[in-house]
């Protein structure tokens, strides 16, 4: 019978890799973390939460399955905001954040997708724990008026510390611990509105013994090994809130370039207040010099102006604040305009009519601004015909007007207005305005051949509007056909000569542009306008810009190049070329595309085909790479236990892959396999012959042997067809000599339930277990002590009956085939933790099943009875001669208090340490070496057939 099973297993091995179908699979994902979470000893989480101390290193790994290999992306959300790691997602399996800060806590998502099905997404919440230094503030009601809330002499000490998790506060007076009710003169309470953020110590009607040293201790109960923090405050009869005085004027008006010093002194407060300077808007200038309460600004500028405040704080009462405003003198933006007689509908200046000249500047401070008027260099005073006024600052600040009533010929000349500040130190601004018979309003025209303007994309162009008149005003340019910004980003651009220069013209800049006169430095009349049309020509935009076409020989291919947009749209011509060889030319009629067919591909037809579509502005190009190269192989990363631990210093690796789109090109006849040790330069290569056609999704297997432990290797795989080499794929294989399962992931490390038993094992954690669980049995945490960690257990409550079995099957573990007549089989140390607590504990058995023996199970380990409320560890040496499987069998005892649990199952190469093994081969011991002679011929045959596909 054993021989029959052996032959069946051998047939299965021979078929593996030859007919492997269906390995394409959508992604699955799970998140694991390095290190132990520092958990709170409270069962308050029903979701995946990882806790870490601020300043430590967070390392999360996204473990994925699926074929082809899924692409991974990490993202993070916190509340409604999304944080993508400084606007760049993390695209590898491991997310590592060194020196993590509190704002980096939140929910982290791992997204895996490979184009099959929906993306797989898992998340984990990261809680960053921290405790800041506590701060004590004091508020007192001593001497308050009777209408206030508190009538007695009362002091409130408030302690606040930022923390996560919530902080617990305690108070001491000297060495005495203060508790609510321990002293009638002391009350300790939390305000309703603070939600545990603070704890207030109220000293009612101060007594002599209340003048003492008070200490506030903030604690998070040593979570994440965060120590308690303490702050002290001495309360005395001199304790008082701060008061200060500024030894400067308000406001302070200074000239640019001067140095200014602000002095702030304390006039009261116990303990001694600390002094800080702030600015009402923005930060303090970098050049300032601070010395206690003295602030010095050397070489002040207009940017340094503003309100500066001195704040005194000693945590008693409210901080004291005094402010002063610094004003830096400035004169800028001098301009003028001429207004003709408003009572006549005429924009010209005429003898006998009124004319007004206006000057405007921006002045700081505005109250120091003065204007002086001159005619031909001589001072001008206000008179009946020459009226000098200043406009209301609320209407037009910094503006002066000269009204010339009944203009005469003798009034022609140059008028000058001079703006100055009374405080001096600032250069005056002079504005000259000429009034004469040649002073006429402006006129705008567009020179011939300057509209429409035709240019090409990327060129530099100048738009011109010719302005006449005296004086010539500023010209404003804007878009006339749409509300979009000008090239400099503003809605209007100024020009003093009427020219608008645009560098690197783009097609979006085509359209109508408006030039118009400004009222400044000219006549205050209705603006003159003109329009200039800009036409930007650009070469055709085509698709596809590049397309790779893979086809085998003797097959047909048709390439198509389509025009998306172009200007001018007619006349368009096209050229098809293979390299430098001209294949076809033509002209577009009504169609928007051109095609080039290849009826039967041959070696000389492969190459890069270029289709150029041409207009006056240039050419757009479609490129087609026609090739017979095979697509890259797709390495299969989900091979379970691909490492064979065969001999002491070397190992073998089961390399598996599928071929992407195998039917796209000619049949793949072989693969070139390259392998090199990580960090080395030289590749060792060999060919793997392929017989027959490869099917889509077919899993191909090749065994790499004689790999040196524990080195990693780079493996390169290149498909070969009659065309030649295809695309290569490279991956790294690593030696992993140990299997470990803590049952934390969703698929419980590929353990499965036995269909032949009476009931199933259950994945459980203390935090998620049913609130109606049976007391006095089962673990209170997983093996590591975490209430959020998972384990597997059997629930023995009703309707379970005595003697019923639950069986849990491990995945199949592979070992390397070897000569059975050689040295002793490789040894493995099998270990696990078990929990057997309760007065009705039954039996826990472990069996070893070798591949091919579907009915024979060899007892490996057994234990029964109550072992106490603790996790115990078992170690067993096993010596399998072929692939094997482990079976955990839990048998229900006589009552409901009989829950059995297992956790942290490990299989490591080599024998267990002697101190870990049981002292005798009892019921709790290990079974001896397992050898099955009937498998020897099968193993030899497998060795001969390897490597295989």
Swiss-Prot record:
<dbReference type="GO" id="GO:0050905">
    <property type="term" value="P:neuromuscular process"/>
</dbReference>
<dbReference type="Pfam" id="PF00629">
    <property type="entry name" value="MAM"/>
</dbReference>
<comment type="subunit">
    <text>Interacts (through the Ig-like domains) with NLGN2.</text>
</comment>
<feature type="disulfide bond">
    <location>
        <begin position="62"/>
        <end position="110"/>
    </location>
</feature>
<feature type="domain" description="Ig-like 2">
    <location>
        <begin position="134"/>
        <end position="232"/>
    </location>
</feature>
<dbReference type="GO" id="GO:1905606">
    <property type="term" value="P:regulation of presynapse assembly"/>
</dbReference>
<dbReference type="InterPro" id="IPR013320">
    <property type="entry name" value="ConA-like_dom_sf"/>
</dbReference>
<comment type="function">
    <text>May be involved in cell-cell interactions.</text>
</comment>
<feature type="glycosylation site" description="N-linked (GlcNAc...) asparagine">
    <location>
        <position position="213"/>
    </location>
</feature>
<feature type="signal peptide">
    <location>
        <begin position="1"/>
        <end position="25"/>
    </location>
</feature>
<feature type="domain" description="Ig-like 3">
    <location>
        <begin position="242"/>
        <end position="328"/>
    </location>
</feature>
<dbReference type="Pfam" id="PF13927">
    <property type="entry name" value="Ig_3"/>
</dbReference>
<dbReference type="InterPro" id="IPR000998">
    <property type="entry name" value="MAM_dom"/>
</dbReference>
<feature type="domain" description="MAM">
    <location>
        <begin position="739"/>
        <end position="914"/>
    </location>
</feature>
<dbReference type="InterPro" id="IPR013783">
    <property type="entry name" value="Ig-like_fold"/>
</dbReference>
<feature type="domain" description="Ig-like 5">
    <location>
        <begin position="442"/>
        <end position="533"/>
    </location>
</feature>
<feature type="glycosylation site" description="N-linked (GlcNAc...) asparagine">
    <location>
        <position position="703"/>
    </location>
</feature>
<keyword id="KW-0472">Membrane</keyword>
<feature type="disulfide bond">
    <location>
        <begin position="159"/>
        <end position="216"/>
    </location>
</feature>
<dbReference type="InterPro" id="IPR003599">
    <property type="entry name" value="Ig_sub"/>
</dbReference>
<keyword id="KW-0449">Lipoprotein</keyword>
<feature type="domain" description="Ig-like 6">
    <location>
        <begin position="540"/>
        <end position="627"/>
    </location>
</feature>
<feature type="disulfide bond">
    <location>
        <begin position="465"/>
        <end position="515"/>
    </location>
</feature>
<feature type="glycosylation site" description="N-linked (GlcNAc...) asparagine">
    <location>
        <position position="92"/>
    </location>
</feature>
<dbReference type="InterPro" id="IPR013098">
    <property type="entry name" value="Ig_I-set"/>
</dbReference>
<dbReference type="InterPro" id="IPR036116">
    <property type="entry name" value="FN3_sf"/>
</dbReference>
<feature type="glycosylation site" description="N-linked (GlcNAc...) asparagine">
    <location>
        <position position="434"/>
    </location>
</feature>
<keyword id="KW-1003">Cell membrane</keyword>
<feature type="lipid moiety-binding region" description="GPI-anchor amidated aspartate">
    <location>
        <position position="924"/>
    </location>
</feature>
<dbReference type="GO" id="GO:0099179">
    <property type="term" value="P:regulation of synaptic membrane adhesion"/>
</dbReference>
<dbReference type="InterPro" id="IPR003961">
    <property type="entry name" value="FN3_dom"/>
</dbReference>
<dbReference type="InterPro" id="IPR036179">
    <property type="entry name" value="Ig-like_dom_sf"/>
</dbReference>
<feature type="glycosylation site" description="N-linked (GlcNAc...) asparagine">
    <location>
        <position position="237"/>
    </location>
</feature>
<dbReference type="GO" id="GO:0043524">
    <property type="term" value="P:negative regulation of neuron apoptotic process"/>
</dbReference>
<feature type="disulfide bond">
    <location>
        <begin position="264"/>
        <end position="310"/>
    </location>
</feature>
<dbReference type="GO" id="GO:0010467">
    <property type="term" value="P:gene expression"/>
</dbReference>
<feature type="glycosylation site" description="N-linked (GlcNAc...) asparagine">
    <location>
        <position position="610"/>
    </location>
</feature>
<keyword id="KW-0325">Glycoprotein</keyword>
<keyword id="KW-1015">Disulfide bond</keyword>
<dbReference type="InterPro" id="IPR007110">
    <property type="entry name" value="Ig-like_dom"/>
</dbReference>
<dbReference type="GO" id="GO:0098982">
    <property type="term" value="C:GABA-ergic synapse"/>
</dbReference>
<feature type="propeptide" description="Removed in mature form">
    <location>
        <begin position="925"/>
        <end position="949"/>
    </location>
</feature>
